[in-house]
UniProtKB/Swiss-Prot annotation:
GO terms for biological process: cell differentiation; male sex determination; male sex differentiation; mRNA splicing, via spliceosome; regulation of mRNA splicing, via spliceosome. Pfam families: RRM_1. The keyword RNA-binding applies. CDD domains: RRM_SF. GO terms for cellular component: catalytic step 2 spliceosome; precatalytic spliceosome; U2 snRNP. The gene is Nix. It comes from Aedes aegypti. This is Male determiner protein Nix.
Length: 288
């Protein structure tokens, strides 16, 4: 049964990968909500997975799932953009593994050893090395090691000729990379993502209910939706004077409960109104 269920999850994940983007080099201080707000500009998001901060590294990766494939294409303009003091990696999750590799013939590694109080950020490194040649991607593995992948081998060779490199009175050691580097920070070996990660992207514990009658109450919503499992929080959205905006959010204790509620209640009648039920980012439930 477990193998069959895992096969189902893998099949479902292969479908939704087309709606997902991989984001690398997110600042350690950024929350899920910060990422959702930044990327929601390009379309409605329905889920997010973010890895916790790693030791000795002030950036982290995430995956955002959109409702539309068009949103994936639009969001790619944020690749190599600044987010705080870092430079983002933004790529479609559906790319083959080889597209996540920084190729050795166009890539250098920069070793950072800040000797004074003026630290050097990824954004500052990007601005300096961009003067040498167009940068395809940057990937930070630790606070002291950043890979820079140029568009051309010529730019890579020119960057090596600049050493020793000086920014903020800090000297940087630059070396040529001897092998391809995987810049997908979720798995150092491949894109064979864990079953747990897949579940988090396929199903979350939050659903949005849209098209509710204007007189709907949180108590009535709880009566109808509690049959799918334990509810941790219900938020009915109202305007400044307290009138219902006719939608709300439910946060379940288990993802299976949220999934059952979505499958069964989407398109059903709620006291005279046909409602729409869909997954929403979990942070949205508490944003009130």
């Amino acid at each position: 049964m477990c193998k069959k269920r895992n096969a189902e999850i893998n099949a479902e994940f292969d479908i939704i990968k087309k709606y997902c983007i991989y984001i690398g080099n997110i600042p350690f201080f950024a929350s899920k909500n910060d990422v959702v707000v930044k990327f929601a500009e390009y379309g409605e998001t329905c889920n997010i997975y973010m890895q916790s901060n790693k030791p000795h590294c002030d950036v982290k990766p995430a995956i955002v799932r959109y409702r539309s494939r068009k949103s994936v294409d639009k969001s790619l303009c944020l690749n190599n953009s600044k987010f705080g003091n870092t430079i983002l990696i933004v790529l479609p999750l559906s790319l083959p593994y080889s597209r996540y590799l920084l190729t050795y013939d166009t890539c250098i590694v920069v070793y950072i050893n800040d000797k004074n109080s003026c630290k050097t950020s990824m954004a500052e490194l990007y601005d300096e090395f961009q003067k040498i040649g167009d940068i395809q991607n940057m990937f930070k593995t630790t606070n002291n090691m950043i890979y820079i992948n140029f568009e051309s081998e010529k730019s890579m060779q020119l960057s090596l000729a600049t050493k020793p490199f000086l920014i903020n009175n800090n000297i940087f050691k630059i070396k040529k990379v001897e092998r391809n580097i995987n810049m997908c920070g979720l798995n150092s070996e491949s894109q064979d993502f864990s079953t747990n990660l897949k579940k988090k992207l396929l199903y979350n514990r939050s659903i949005g209910i849209f098209g509710l009658p204007s007189n709907a109450t949180e108590e009535r919503i709880a009566q109808i939706f509690s049959r799918f499992g334990d509810i941790q929080k219900i938020t009915l959205i109202c305007d400044v004077v307290g009138n219902s905006k006719q939608y709300g959010f439910i946060y379940y204790k288990k993802r299976t409960s949220a999934n059952a509620a979505k499958v069964i209640m989407d398109g059903e009648n709620f006291e005279g109104n046909k409602i729409s039920v869909r997954f929403v980012p979990e942070k949205k439930v508490f944003k009130n």
